[in-house]
Amino acid sequence: MTASLWQQCLNRLQDELPSAEFSMWIRPLQAELSDNTLTLYAPNRFVLDWVRDKYLIRVNGIINELCGVDGPTLRFDIGNRPHPVAVARAPARGADPVNNSQKSWESKAEAKPEPNHKSNTNVNYTFENFVEGKSNQLARAAARQVADNPGGAYNPLFLYGGTGLGKTHLLHAVGNAIKERKQDAKVIYMHSERFVQDMVKALQNNAIEEFKRYYRSVDALLIDDIQFFANKERSQEEFFHTFNALLEGNQQIILTSDRYPKEINGVEDRLKSRFGWGLTVAIEPPELETRVAILMRKADENQIHLPDEVAFFIAKRLRSNVRELEGALNRVIANANFTGRAINIDFVREALRDLLALQEKLVTIDNIQKTVAEYYKIKLADLLSKRRSRSVARPRQLAMALAKELTNHSLPEIGDAFGGRDHTTVLHACRKIEQLKEESHDIKEDYSNLIRTLSS
């Protein structure tokens, strides 16, 4: 009964939800039916709260459609189900890693002697010192789940986003967490170019079998910047077979890239297809609150008092990535140590003079308007006009929201730059875009793409 009912629920949800959303939140759930109560087990508190908040009504609706008024009561818990149950449909790729993945992963180390593996993970990168915000919340949750259950539902895990947003930090954090939980776990972190170099060396030394055995005997393979495989046909061929071997053995794969898998040029379609077999998650540029939190944490690590107003001053002006923020703060701290001066806004303005000037030059309202018009293939004059058609109004609202986030102009100044509109119009546009980013994947993706374009 449990398998039949929950499998039908899974099938309905898989048909209704975007594949990434289904893989992220629904596929990891386990279920048990007892005393007319269907209990859904989530892997952690974060997933439980999210599913209960976002999907409770729909799951109850499906149960009522299938069972009528006498259907089971739905409840949630954290942990593993007491008995086996159905799992979601998955793309055909051998054994489904959702079932028995933990058991096979735990026992594989004892199965046969393996090569000596050096992990290369940086112990300074952990989940504890990763600053979480709306921009990276899903990526961190997915990475945490992989660390707790390697080889499970999120395999492979593919993280993508611009430079300096925390992808590498999460790779190391997963590797460190796996090794902390199981000290003899064979975890390898590497840049994709290292894989290429190792393969070339193996070919030169007639040691390709040793190369294969080394990479196919790991518990977790963490590869950074997979886009560097582009146009390296022999490396792609070998990685294709390594990828398949690891997934068949329920061994975890995590990949990062600066772009969505299908947008990676020079990589074979069969590889790009496999990159999306598990879960693909974007990491966005950090929002203001996260940027401030990053600066405050970095200052604490350096035992430096950073006034709130100074943190906000820096965060409002440097928006592109975490690396840029940390570099700016390091410069401020160094200048303060050299001069003995107190850290305040005037001092920061002086210490970061060239950086702030460059940022203000790069992102202007005029530049935002031209970029948005080009992105949506509309005339700039229409963007600034009084036209209210959806094809023009929505890009205009996006441009206003971007101007508020990426520049230091006031709402009246932004409104004036958009054909003399009132500041309340700008405020409405910003609120509308925030709402649409929560409701529409397309709007969220467009906004993120424009942020990346304007911040690069």
From Swiss-Prot:
<dbReference type="GO" id="GO:0016887">
    <property type="term" value="F:ATP hydrolysis activity"/>
</dbReference>
<dbReference type="InterPro" id="IPR038454">
    <property type="entry name" value="DnaA_N_sf"/>
</dbReference>
<feature type="binding site">
    <location>
        <position position="166"/>
    </location>
    <ligand>
        <name>ATP</name>
    </ligand>
</feature>
<keyword id="KW-0067">ATP-binding</keyword>
<dbReference type="InterPro" id="IPR003593">
    <property type="entry name" value="AAA+_ATPase"/>
</dbReference>
<dbReference type="GO" id="GO:0008289">
    <property type="term" value="F:lipid binding"/>
</dbReference>
<dbReference type="InterPro" id="IPR010921">
    <property type="entry name" value="Trp_repressor/repl_initiator"/>
</dbReference>
<dbReference type="InterPro" id="IPR020591">
    <property type="entry name" value="Chromosome_initiator_DnaA-like"/>
</dbReference>
<feature type="region of interest" description="Domain III, AAA+ region">
    <location>
        <begin position="120"/>
        <end position="336"/>
    </location>
</feature>
<dbReference type="GO" id="GO:0005886">
    <property type="term" value="C:plasma membrane"/>
</dbReference>
<dbReference type="Pfam" id="PF08299">
    <property type="entry name" value="Bac_DnaA_C"/>
</dbReference>
<feature type="region of interest" description="Disordered">
    <location>
        <begin position="92"/>
        <end position="122"/>
    </location>
</feature>
<feature type="binding site">
    <location>
        <position position="168"/>
    </location>
    <ligand>
        <name>ATP</name>
    </ligand>
</feature>
<dbReference type="InterPro" id="IPR001957">
    <property type="entry name" value="Chromosome_initiator_DnaA"/>
</dbReference>
<protein>
    <recommendedName>
        <fullName>Chromosomal replication initiator protein DnaA</fullName>
    </recommendedName>
</protein>
<keyword id="KW-0238">DNA-binding</keyword>
<keyword id="KW-0963">Cytoplasm</keyword>
<dbReference type="InterPro" id="IPR024633">
    <property type="entry name" value="DnaA_N_dom"/>
</dbReference>
<dbReference type="Pfam" id="PF00308">
    <property type="entry name" value="Bac_DnaA"/>
</dbReference>
<comment type="subunit">
    <text>Oligomerizes as a right-handed, spiral filament on DNA at oriC.</text>
</comment>
<comment type="function">
    <text>Plays an essential role in the initiation and regulation of chromosomal replication. ATP-DnaA binds to the origin of replication (oriC) to initiate formation of the DNA replication initiation complex once per cell cycle. Binds the DnaA box (a 9 base pair repeat at the origin) and separates the double-stranded (ds)DNA. Forms a right-handed helical filament on oriC DNA; dsDNA binds to the exterior of the filament while single-stranded (ss)DNA is stabiized in the filament's interior.</text>
</comment>
<dbReference type="GO" id="GO:0003688">
    <property type="term" value="F:DNA replication origin binding"/>
</dbReference>
<dbReference type="InterPro" id="IPR027417">
    <property type="entry name" value="P-loop_NTPase"/>
</dbReference>
<dbReference type="GO" id="GO:0006275">
    <property type="term" value="P:regulation of DNA replication"/>
</dbReference>
<dbReference type="GO" id="GO:0005737">
    <property type="term" value="C:cytoplasm"/>
</dbReference>
<feature type="binding site">
    <location>
        <position position="164"/>
    </location>
    <ligand>
        <name>ATP</name>
    </ligand>
</feature>
<dbReference type="Pfam" id="PF11638">
    <property type="entry name" value="DnaA_N"/>
</dbReference>
<feature type="region of interest" description="Domain IV, binds dsDNA">
    <location>
        <begin position="337"/>
        <end position="456"/>
    </location>
</feature>
<keyword id="KW-0446">Lipid-binding</keyword>
<dbReference type="InterPro" id="IPR013317">
    <property type="entry name" value="DnaA_dom"/>
</dbReference>
<feature type="compositionally biased region" description="Basic and acidic residues">
    <location>
        <begin position="105"/>
        <end position="117"/>
    </location>
</feature>
<keyword id="KW-0547">Nucleotide-binding</keyword>
<comment type="similarity">
    <text>Belongs to the DnaA family.</text>
</comment>
<dbReference type="GO" id="GO:0006270">
    <property type="term" value="P:DNA replication initiation"/>
</dbReference>
<keyword id="KW-0235">DNA replication</keyword>
<feature type="binding site">
    <location>
        <position position="167"/>
    </location>
    <ligand>
        <name>ATP</name>
    </ligand>
</feature>
<feature type="region of interest" description="Domain II">
    <location>
        <begin position="83"/>
        <end position="119"/>
    </location>
</feature>
<dbReference type="GO" id="GO:0005524">
    <property type="term" value="F:ATP binding"/>
</dbReference>
<feature type="region of interest" description="Domain I, interacts with DnaA modulators">
    <location>
        <begin position="1"/>
        <end position="83"/>
    </location>
</feature>
<dbReference type="InterPro" id="IPR018312">
    <property type="entry name" value="Chromosome_initiator_DnaA_CS"/>
</dbReference>
<dbReference type="InterPro" id="IPR013159">
    <property type="entry name" value="DnaA_C"/>
</dbReference>
